Amino acid sequence: MDAFTHSLNAQPGWPEFQRARLRRTRDFDDLDPSPNGEPEIFEFPIEIARQHDVVTLYLELLDTVSSAKSCEYYFRRYPFRGLPVSRHEHLSNVCEMFFGRFYQFKERLKKYSGAIAAASPGNDLDFGPFIKTFSTEFDRELRARHEIHHHRRFSDLAIDHIFISGLLADRRPGNGWNAEHLATYRKTTHEWALRAKNRGARLDAFMEAIAEATLHSCSHFLTIP
């Protein structure tokens, strides 16, 4: 990947385009979206553009894995003490974000397989069975994301108990419900954090397989001469 990225500097106009984009990002408050008519998209030659798609989409897959793994720490922390965001709401939101990462990975993987086919025509790489394996491995997460997107918010018995015990703690202070609420929340978030860590490790394994397959099918532009 690094070798290919460095090779782009030999493309006429690319280094200048990158510098101009960095300037626009740095000074975005002072500039129009496209100052002086500068193009916002760099046009590579078709072959280089297809190779560039492979690299950028691979990096997007890596970013999705990193985002899914970071959910472990969202589960571990409740940063809204004293604010109008309940523990129940925070936990539900993080669960939904976590599930969404697996759908995101699957959809990006489909797009990535198309980029591989375009950049390396005639290769014998078939992502179909691999995507099916991914769908089977993460079936629970993908089903939960589908349910959230099309029907209702995510909940389970533990999260529902956090919601109810929180209501009772507010309405019946000193009756033991606050301790019950906090204990259930700590136990449940610990379990979710562990799940995020374990599922993140499985995503890492999938990325290793993708990297090996990519190097095999795209060795003509992803190896160092």
Regions found by a protein language model. Give the residues of each.
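Acidic, Ser/Thr/Gly/Pro-rich intrinsically disordered interaction regions
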Residues: 1-55, 125-225
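Extended amphipathic alpha-helical scaffold segments
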Residues: 26-32, 38, 68-79, 109, ...
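Flexible secondary-structure boundary motifs
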Residues: 95-135, 151, 155-156
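Secondary-structure edge/capping motif, primarily at the C-terminal ends of alpha-helices
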Residues: 72-87, 116-119, 152, 217, ...
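A glycine-rich, hydrophobic loop/mini-helix early in the fold
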Residues: 51-92
